[in-house]
Amino acid sequence: MASFVAGQQGKEPAFESYPVRVESKTARAIDFRNSPGASKFRTRLREAIKGDVNFAGRYIISGWGCGSGCSQMAIIDAKTGRVFMPDALAGVSAWYYDVEDDYEVYTYKKNSRLLVVRGAPGPMTDGDTEQEPGSYYYEWRPNRLRLIKFVPRPKPKNA
């Protein structure tokens, strides 16, 4: 699947191509009972649920560091309080060379199902991921991320 996605040609996916209606938040607390793994991040998730919807119409994305050059994220359903922790967000190793000044590891919008991750996503093993660094374009489907395109990182100018 990854080689198929990496081999796709054409423009990078646009947020406007994945529209969604923004709903109001109704959850007041995190549903730890139905959110495997979420209890390890209680403080961060409890703070996040206090905020407004910021992704895919009814979700709140929250993130935290997991070491030098590493970050993790969770997606909270703002209607139910349930937390989703996709493997792709369980330790993104960021890359920093040959990128624009306004570089962001994660890019998302509250009115779009598109999530862009720049780095090497996936669970960290021995301080590294098995994924190739680059820009990963995911579509949020009910309760999961679907990889729709991968663009390898640019080679360093000095290489």
Spell out what each predicted region is:
Residues 48-54, 102-111:
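Structural signature of eukaryotic scaffold interfaces centered on beta-propeller domains
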Residues 57-64, 113-119:
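Short beta-strand elements that form the blades of beta-propeller/WD-repeat-like
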Residues 24-37, 75-87, 132, 137-150:
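Surface-exposed loop/turn elements that mediate protein-protein interactions on large endomembrane-trafficking
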Residues 4-23, 107-159:
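Acidic, small-residue rich beta-repeat scaffolds with periodic aromatic anchors
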Residues 54, 64-70:
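His-enriched metal-coordination microenvironments in redox/metal-binding proteins
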Residues 4-52:
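Terminal domain-start segments
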Residues 68-73, 99-103, 131-134:
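Short, surface-exposed coil-to-beta transition loops
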Residues 88-97, 155:
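Surface-exposed loop and turn segments in beta-propeller and other repeat-based domains
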